[in-house]
């Protein structure tokens, strides 16, 4: 039964147009807006506080911060900057989804900036479900359409990411 529900969910996600997926994803991001006010600048760092608390096994990818706690993240200028870069990247991925050429170029650029970090290639897909859970931790109730949108973005993102990893001769799935 679970398989049938999952299959129906995936079929529904792919039945939507790229523009609909874009709109659904962007509407989910209203809980973490971009901006220059102190509270908006904190949104990116909030992701890393969530991430370091709930995915401690992945802290190993952050050299010098492997033992950081959420309190350490809250005081870190490094994670303020990284958080805002990540938040911008998620918004860009969502906002360019309906322009596949630009979306895929953005993914390749993202991979190019991470080639020396030794990331497990499966993380490029897993990130999107982690990000959904982060949004939910901020009080956002994601609709089925919004979840499907992030799944579609994650699938396309991962597809291009794996191609770019292979291009660099790096492990890929």
Curated annotation (Swiss-Prot):
Which cellular compartments is it found in?
Secreted, Extracellular space
Quote the cellular component terms of the Gene Ontology held in the record. extracellular region
Q: Where is the signal peptide?
A: 1-15
Broad class of the protein's primary localization: secreted
Binding locations of heme b: 114
Q: Name one GO molecular function term.
A: oxygen carrier activity
Q: Which UniProt keywords apply?
A: Heme, Iron, Metal-binding, Oxygen transport, Secreted, Signal, Transport
Q: Where is the Globin domain?
A: 25-166
Q: Note whether Secreted occurs among the keywords.
A: yes
A Pfam family of the record is Globin
Family matches, as InterPro entries: Globin, Globin-like_sf, Globin/Proto, Globin_nematode, Mb-like_M
Q: Which domain of life is it from?
A: Eukaryota
State the protein's purpose: May be a globin and may play a role in oxygen transport.
Q: Which family does it belong to?
A: Belongs to the globin family.
User: This protein is called what?
Assistant: Globin-like host-protective antigen
The beginning of the lineage is:
Eukaryota, Metazoa, Ecdysozoa, Nematoda, Chromadorea
């Amino acid at each position: 039964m679970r398989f049938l529900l999952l299959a129906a969910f995936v079929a529904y996600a792919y039945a939507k147009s790229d523009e609909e997926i874009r709109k659904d994803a962007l509407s989910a991001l209203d809980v973490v807006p971009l901006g220059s006010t102190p509270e908006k600048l904190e949104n990116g760092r909030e992701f890393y506080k969530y991430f370091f608390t709930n995915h401690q096994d992945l802290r190993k990818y952050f050299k010098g911060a492997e033992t950081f706690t959420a309190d350490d993240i809250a005081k870190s200028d490094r994670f303020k900057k990284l958080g805002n870069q990540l938040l911008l990247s998620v918004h860009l991925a969502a906002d360019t989804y309906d322009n596949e050429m630009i979306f895929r170029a953005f993914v390749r650029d993202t991979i190019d900036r991470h080639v020396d970090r030794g990331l497990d290639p499966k993380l490029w897909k897993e990130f999107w479900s982690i990000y959904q859970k982060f949004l939910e931790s901020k009080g956002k109730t994601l609709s089925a359409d919004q979840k499907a949108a992030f799944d579609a973005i994650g699938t396309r993102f991962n597809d291009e990411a794996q191609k770019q990893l292979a291009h660099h001769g790096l492990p890929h799935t």
